[in-house]
Amino acid sequence: MFYSIVAIFVGAGLGALLRWCLSLTLNAFFPAVPLGTLAANLLGGYVIGVAAVVFTVRVGLPPEWRLFVITGFLGGLTTFSTYSVEVMTHALEGEFGWALAVAALHLTGSFALTALGMWTARAWLAAA
């Protein structure tokens, strides 16, 4: 149990730190669509796709790795609450086009990158 807690704790801290760095670095480029949040969610979509395949195929991996990557790191990195407030801020300010654009970018982008991550992992594992 101790190692599970440590895996989640360390993963979450690293994921949250990366999300913060992405926001600091990218949000200033295009304020209408906070690119840091988008990048975190898209990267998280790709990594969860890879992880879903790897942890399904490589059943011998210690369970702490799954906790570290999926529960910890991706839990700290991705952010549905920030995405939600960014979409609703646009909507409440009457910027419905921006609200829909931000929502569509996050959802379609994340689904597409999750599929790409799964494809990447399957190709990588088949070649190994």
From Swiss-Prot:
Keyword Transport: yes
A GO MF term: metal ion binding
Subcellular location: Cell inner membrane
Predominant location category: membrane
Topology with respect to the bilayer: Multi-pass membrane protein
Record flagged with keyword Transcription: no
Transmembrane segments: 2-22, 35-55, 67-87, 96-116
Catalysed reactions listed for this entry: fluoride(in) = fluoride(out)
Activity regulation info: Na(+) is not transported, but it plays an essential structural role and its presence is essential for fluoride channel function.
Keyword line: Cell inner membrane, Cell membrane, Ion channel, Ion transport, Membrane, Metal-binding, Sodium, Transmembrane, Transmembrane helix, Transport
Gene Ontology, cellular component aspect: plasma membrane
BP terms from Gene Ontology: cellular detoxification of fluoride
Free-text function comment from the UniProt entry: Fluoride-specific ion channel. Important for reducing fluoride concentration in the cell, thus reducing its toxicity.
NCBIfam families linked: crcB, PRK14196.1
Family that this chain belongs to: Belongs to the fluoride channel Fluc/FEX (TC 1.A.43) family.
HAMAP family recorded: FluC
The protein, known as: Fluoride-specific ion channel FluC
Species for this entry: Burkholderia cenocepacia (strain ATCC BAA-245 / DSM 16553 / LMG 16656 / NCTC 13227 / J2315 / CF5610)
Name of the coding gene: fluC
